[in-house]
C-alpha cells in the first residue's frame, strides 16, 4: 500500500536457551521442566497424542537474519519457520522423563506441522537442530 517491503515469518513452537518455564507464555517443554524441578508430575491434557512442530530458537534467529538480507522477499510473503516434522506431547514428556499425570483435554488442534518449503526456496533456510538432540543438554543445564 505504501511501498513498504514486508515479509512475515510464522514460527512454530520455539524452544531453546532461556525459555520460560512458568507463566502464560511457557511452552510445554518448559512447563514440564518446571514441574519436574518442583517434584510434580508432568501434566498432560488429553491423551498426549497432540503433535507439535518444535523449532530451535537459533534456527529462528537465522531465518530472521536471512529474511532481512534477502532480495527474494518483501512482497508480503508469509513464510513458515518450523522443523517440518513434529513430536507428540507424550514424546516430549518421555524426553524430559518422569511421572505423567493426564487431565481433561482442552480444545486445541491435534497437530501442527510446518511446510517450510518456501523458507528453503526464498531464504535458503533449513532447520539445523532437532528437539531430541537438544533436550539432553537442556536437562543438564537445568539440573534434571
Model-inferred region functions:
Residues 36-144:
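C-terminal substrate-binding subdomain of Rossmann-fold SDR/epimerase-dehydratase oxidoreductases
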Residues 21-22, 73:
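Active-site loop immediately N-terminal to the catalytic Tyr-X3-Lys motif
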Residues 18-21, 47:
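Conserved catalytic-core motifs of eukaryotic protein kinase domains, centered on the activation segment
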Residues 2-6, 33, 107-108:
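N-proximal short alpha-helices
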Residues 1-17, 100:
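Conserved beta-loop-beta element that borders a ligand/cofactor-binding pocket
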Residues 17-18, 122:
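Residues that scaffold the ATP/ADP-binding catalytic core of kinase and kinase-like folds
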